[in-house]
A protein has these predicted regions:
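Glycine-biased, small-residue-rich flexible motifs in mid-sequence functional cores and linkers
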Residues: 1-2, 81-359
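Short, positively charged patches
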Residues: 1-129, 133-140
């Protein structure tokens, strides 16, 4: 038996990460064979509560079957598992107070300059504009936008990141195979293709009042900074802000109109010590060296649509049809943008439908 298989099994029977790691650490500390986990009285040893110990006793005999079913399930949906024991487990998460023992991953879990965006599920037009403005300004740098793919600010943040060809990671409050809300199915697929969707919950887990607060610690834990865009007085995003502060992350809040219910939470965060996010420099100051990564001055004159096309060509997606597919737009519209970029001397045509960057 492998240590990671034990963690996957415990996760599958709904053990918390804390209890899963307690069980594994006890076996390792006592130099006991992993295969004997079911023979131990974890209740007597005060490792587990009676409820958890009973669940372990009841399900221990299903170990092989559960591991087999999990393996079949994730293979069928293009998901892989990363445990806290693995080298490719995110370092950002490894050292938080309650790290997830298991992560189900759909996509490529690459993380650089991670920044979380959280906020109200119902939001104002100001919140929409704030997300667009901030993420548009981040497009000149290699940021990873982390959020929760819920209604509202989460969805806006992921979509704007994708539009700007920024890496994005969605942390679910459900199992990796449960899309919530269902209306975000297309977004789920696009994030999986161009970034990553992750969950600590076993496949099939439905949304409930406990899963979303639990996933908030992962959103903040993955990130170096957290931006709260809009929040009512009792908003769940304030939980993420609190967790971020406890994890030593910097918390930004977008200042809002004092008469708006959607800005009560963010304004109070600022009053209590969060950094008011007024301009993009406020964020960049917390990512030393990012300005030296690449000189993007020549891109500044491009509008958002031109930038989206430019970024694709720069990545090697230089065929007109492929650009249309990636940006989900019609050929005639993309051709107009390509022509504008040609006239600006930024790209050139190298074949009937292919282009390359000139500068």
């Amino acid at each position: 038996m492998k240590e990671r298989d034990l963690l996957i099994f415990l996760n599958a029977i709904n053990f918390s990460s804390e209890n899963s790691l307690k069980v594994l650490d006890y076996l390792i500390d006592k130099n006991l064979p992993l295969e004997d986990f079911y023979k131990l009285d974890f209740l007597e040893e005060k490792i587990l509560t009676e409820r958890s110990a009973n669940r372990l006793d009841e399900r221990a005999g299903d170990f092989d079957l559960i591991i087999e079913k999990i393996s079949e399930k994730i293979n069928s949906i293009g998901v892989h598992i990363v445990t806290i024991l693995d080298e490719d487990y995110p370092d950002e998460l490894r050292y938080i107070e309650d790290p997830p023992s298991v992560l189900y991953v759909r996509g490529n879990l690459k993380i650089y300059n991670p920044i979380a965006f959280v906020g109200a599920r119902s939001h104002s037009s100001y919140g929409n504009m704030a997300v667009n403005k901030i993420i548009d300004d981040l497009r000149f740098y290699d940021f990873t936008i982390v959020s929760g793919m819920a209604y509202g600010i989460d969805t806006l943040s992921h979509r704007r990141a994708l539009l700007n060809n920024l890496n994005t990671i969605a942390v679910l409050g459900t199992g990796i195979d449960v899309i919530y809300p269902k209306s975000n199915k297309a977004l789920y697929e696009e994030i999986s293709e161009k970034g990553a969707v992750i969950s600590e919950f076993p496949p099939g887990t439905q949304a409930n009042k406990f899963t979303f607060p639990m996933r908030n610690r992962i959103i903040s834990g993955l990130s170096k900074t957290v931006v709260v865009v809009e929040a009512k007085d009792k908003s769940g995003s304030l939980i993420t802000a609190r967790l971020a502060a406890e994890q030593g992350r910097e918390v930004f809040a977008v200042p809002g109109n004092i008469t708006s219910i959607y800005s009560v939470g963010t304004n109070k965060l600022i009053r209590d010590g969060a950094i008011p996010l007024v301009e993009i420099k406020d964020i960049l100051d917390f990512y030393p060296g990012i300005l030296s990564k690449k000189d993007n001055e020549e891109k500044i004159d491009l509008d958002l649509e031109e930038m989206a096309v430019y970024n694709l060509i720069e990545k090697g997606i230089n065929n007109t049809n492929d650009i249309c597919i990636n940006l989900n737009n019609e050929v005639f519209y993309i051709n107009k943008i390509l022509t504008k970029l040609e006239l600006k001397g930024i790209i050139e045509k190298i074949s009937m439908n292919e282009f390359q960057i000139l500068k």
